[in-house]
Amino acid sequence: MSITPPFLLACIDLRGAELTATQLRATLPRGGADVEAVLPTVWPIVQAVAECGADAALEFGALFDGVRPPTVRVPDAALDAALAGLDPDVRDALQVMIERTRVVHADQRRTDVTTALGPGATVTERWVPVERVGLYVPGGNAVYPSSVVMNVVPAQTAGVDSLVVASPPQFTSGGRFHGLPHPTILAAARLLGVDEVWAVGGAQAVALLAYGGTDSDDCELAPVDMITGPGNIYVTAAKRLCRSRVGIDGEAGPTEIAILADHTADPAHVAADMISQAEHDEMAASVLVTPSTDLADATDAELAAQLRTTVHRKRVVAALGGRQSAIILVDDLEAGVKVVNLYAAEHLEIQTAEASRVASRIRCAGAIFVGPWAPVSLGDYCAGSNHVLPTAGFARHSGGLSVQTFLRGIHVVNYTKTALKDISGHVITLAKAEDLPAHGEAVRRRFAR
């Protein structure tokens, strides 16, 4: 295939190559953010907020964002006003998104299970929700009410008692946001029944969620037990630094899409889907894996054509031209499956003949979109699936945000005297084998008299 200006997408030809895991890890495109590099910058922010609370968080917000709200907590009146002023079409779409997401996540809720190992011997696994959760919703290039839905719905379904949404205060030359998070974010929170929203963003938001503090009006800002939600590299670094104090959902990097396609795919669809993810930011990854050189050439031409009318063209061109994006040529679909399993994309589309059969062979992906009528954009909004997904290859060992994220499994052990006596000899033997005699003695003494 040939790459023609102005398009800059790289071509990686793996035809005839030995597709070992080591070689693929070295060859496949992946940008990613160097979180380690910003830890020294973020650590003083976390320390300052841990020591000084809301005052420090607000000061950092004024320094980085140029706006300082009077209080961290958004007043109820502002939430009500945001919902009242929400465009009716947007409200209807959000309501549909919420309903569909609730339906899917309701089926994820685990039930307690009791296992009997003999008369009087049971182990019950109880699923208990995290008590208080902080949900981070970023600002930046776009407004993300969908992220409010995707974080809040599984937490509510899990039974989390206390939720707080944190999102950066917005500033415009006209001052129309008055130092509050974007009104669409506030409206989405209100639609979901969330009444605690903090006007704070960035690393300082993560630190304040982790350590808590006192607001400017002397109201308590209680710390959370877990923080979820995507953000930029500084947010990710702060989550890493705070994870010894709170649980986190993971470290989200730039968004990514991989498309495994053959000659049956429509190049216009493939190109549109690659552009749709590239418009997130300049570090977004768009990767096409195909055995068809005809599709590769046609997709390249479609990308060039569609870029002429793309609204965020500069951002998209930068993302598609970055080292994280490429068209990858493989010998056949068998090789393509091997490549995408190793790549472990956040979003993986299967646009091939017998797409469902091919999809059944995928073991590593944040989410899989099967066939020509399931674009990633559907999953971003109204499929019912969750769009908070592992990036940077983390799908090899982690899954996306779900109801389980907010649940803790607790084993409840219940044995009668007879049941313990029946197994006591094995307990004492194993304790002796591990040179932990007091363990065995704790059992033996119960039957000494």
UniProtKB/Swiss-Prot annotation:
Q: Give the record's family classification.
A: Belongs to the histidinol dehydrogenase family.
List the catalysed reactions. L-histidinol + 2 NAD(+) + H2O = L-histidine + 2 NADH + 3 H(+)
HAMAP family named among the record's database cross-references: HisD
Q: Which CDD domains match?
A: Histidinol_dh (cd06572)
One Pfam match, given by its short name, reads Histidinol_dh
Which regions form coiled coils? none
Q: Whose protein is this, by species?
A: Mycobacterium leprae (strain TN)
Q: Which Gene3D superfamilies match?
A: 1.20.5.1300, Nitrogenase molybdenum iron protein domain
What is this protein identified as? Answer: Histidinol dehydrogenase
* InterPro entries attached to this UniProt entry: Ald_DH/histidinol_DH (IPR016161), Histidinol_DH_CS (IPR001692), Histidinol_DH_monofunct (IPR022695), Hstdl_DH (IPR012131)
User: Gene that codes for this?
Assistant: hisD
